[in-house]
């Protein structure tokens, strides 16, 4: 079993923003794996399917980025996923635009959504796929930056990164985080 969580903010005003690359990845995986996402008790949208012989669930919290922990915790408990079966996909300003980084766990590195998930799960030991969005912003303008859309040039890079991220997640589902790290880091 695998639970793939993509972080972002709900609402059309956030579509296409840097902070929502996790949501975009879930949408791509949903299409590729023909998994339909449905409302899951108000805190998230959720869909289940198969990849090869593995049960796969896709999830997008609807609690806004910085409050993702309650939705992730609820989905894991409701559907019976363990920590080792979960991977959280999110934006990262510490990586160049389009750069991917897979990790088996670790600190939140300043990402408030990850901090909230760590707080709710009580552990830092869950896999992550970090998707670089760059950090081309002035001091004090981080929020404006992450909530803004990509430039046309950045969008081309991000689209390619999301293709690679889709493949990285499928590798995670097939063989775990270390196989995915060896292939995509």
Where are these regions (language model features)?
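Hydrophobic alpha-helical segments within soluble ligand-binding/sensing domains
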Residues: 110-113
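Nucleotide and nucleotide-moiety/phosphate-recognizing core
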Residues: 2-105, 115-129, 136-141, 148, ...
């Amino acid at each position: 079993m695998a639970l793939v969580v993509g972080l972002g903010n709900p609402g059309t005003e956030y579509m296409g923003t840097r902070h929502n690359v996790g949501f975009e990845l879930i949408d791509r995986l949903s299409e590729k794996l023909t998994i339909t996402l449905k409302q899951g008790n108000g805190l998230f949208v959720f869909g289940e399917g198969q990849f090869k012989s593995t049960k796969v669930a896709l999830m997008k919290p609807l609690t806004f980025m910085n409050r993702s922990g309650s939705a992730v915790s609820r989905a894991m408990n409701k559907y019976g996923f363990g920590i080792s079966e979960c991977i959280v996909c999110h934006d990262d300003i510490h990586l160049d635009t389009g750069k991917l980084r897979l990790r088996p766990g670790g600190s939140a590195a300043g990402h408030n959504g990850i901090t909230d998930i760590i707080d709710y799960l009580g552990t830092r030991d869950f896999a992550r796929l970090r998707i670089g969005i760059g950090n081309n912003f002035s001091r004090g303008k981080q929020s404006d930056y992450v909530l803004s859309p990509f430039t046309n040039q950045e969008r081309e890079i991000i689209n390619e990164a999301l293709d690679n991220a889709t493949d990285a997640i499928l590798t995670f589902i097939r063989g775990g985080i270390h196989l995915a790290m060896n292939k995509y880091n």
